[in-house]
Amino acid sequence: MTYNIILAKSALELIPEEIKNKIRKSRVYKYDILDSNYHYKAMEKLKDKEMRGRPDIIHISLLNILDSPINHEKKLNIYIHTYDDKVLKINPETRLPRNYFRFLGVMEKVLKGERNHLIKMEEKTLEDLLNEINAKKIAIMTKTGKLTHPKLLKEYDTFIIGGFPYGKLKINKEKVFGDIKEISIYNKGLMAWTVCGIICYSLSF
């Protein structure tokens, strides 16, 4: 069986036009990708600022996913759905840079529309993506969901993990054909990359 793993509403985006004039590039950070560590002041009045500007979450999560046994067995479809409704389909054989800044360089090119044979980008909503991949049993990972033992994760074919630091993932369930359940794998909140690791490990064995 092949599973789908989606980092949703991910805090990975180009610097929004409305704050571009407030940001100056430096020797340390020369990328056009929003990062709250470097753009905190410019983001003060940005809508949903608490959810945005954390590409490091996506970087670490992808490193965990790509190096998992289930991915090496080619039984995983990997998607990044971004805050501004772009979807990146990650080829399972992608060798992602381990260096954060090199990762930003790759993602900046992809988000600007440069062709990459391992990372394909399209514009679509999360709901459209779920219907397109024919997701039937969908698990939204949330700390307030039904506590579920990791060994039961194989009952689902699609897993949605919030790719942002704070806030709640909103999804219009009426627009999704598949059955959606909110579940939790621990009684406290976990970082996205930890959740990704647990899911991938549980599906591998």
UniProtKB/Swiss-Prot annotation:
It comes from the Archaea. CDD domains: Nep1-like. It catalyses: pseudouridine(914) in M. jannaschii 16S rRNA + S-adenosyl-L-methionine = N(1)-methylpseudouridine(914) in M. jannaschii 16S rRNA + S-adenosyl-L-homocysteine + H(+). GO terms for biological process: rRNA base methylation. S-adenosyl-L-methionine binds at M141, T142, K143, G162, G167, I185, Y186, N187, K188, G189, L190. Its EC number is 2.1.1.-. Pfam families: EMG1 (PF03587). Keywords: Methyltransferase, Ribosome biogenesis, RNA-binding, rRNA processing, rRNA-binding, S-adenosyl-L-methionine, Transferase. GO terms for molecular function: protein homodimerization activity; rRNA (pseudouridine) methyltransferase activity; rRNA binding. Homodimer. Belongs to the class IV-like SAM-binding methyltransferase superfamily. RNA methyltransferase NEP1 family. Methyltransferase involved in ribosomal biogenesis. Specifically catalyzes the N1-methylation of pseudouridine at position 914 (Psi914) in 16S rRNA. Is not able to methylate uridine at this position. This is Ribosomal RNA small subunit methyltransferase Nep1. It comes from Methanocaldococcus jannaschii (strain ATCC 43067 / DSM 2661 / JAL-1 / JCM 10045 / NBRC 100440). The lineage of its organism: Archaea, Methanobacteriati, Methanobacteriota, Methanomada group, Methanococci. The gene is nep1.
